[in-house]
Amino acid sequence: LVSVSPAFNGNYFVE
């Protein structure tokens, strides 16, 4: 599922 925490350059990361 997709995480609600921003990762990398403000993009959402799939976890």
UniProtKB/Swiss-Prot annotation:
Enzyme class: hydrolase
Gene Ontology terms for molecular function: metal ion binding; metallopeptidase activity; toxin activity
Main subcellular location: secreted
Stretches assigned to coiled coil: none
Post-translational modification: N-glycosylated.
Keyword Transferase among UniProt keywords: no
Ranges where the Peptidase M12B domain occurs: 11-15
Entry binding sites for Ca(2+): N11, F13, E15
Cysteines engaged in disulfide bonds, as pairs: none
SUBUNIT field: Heterotrimer; disulfide-linked. The heterotrimer consists of 1 heavy chain and 2 light chains (lectins): LC1 (AC P0C8J2) and LC2 (AC P0C8J3).
Family: Belongs to the venom metalloproteinase (M12B) family. P-III subfamily. P-IIId sub-subfamily.
Further details from the record: Negative results: does not activate prothrombin or plasminogen.
Protein name according to UniProt: Factor X-activator 1 heavy chain
Organism in which the protein naturally occurs: Vipera ammodytes ammodytes (Western sand viper)
Lineage: Eukaryota, Metazoa, Chordata, Craniata, Vertebrata
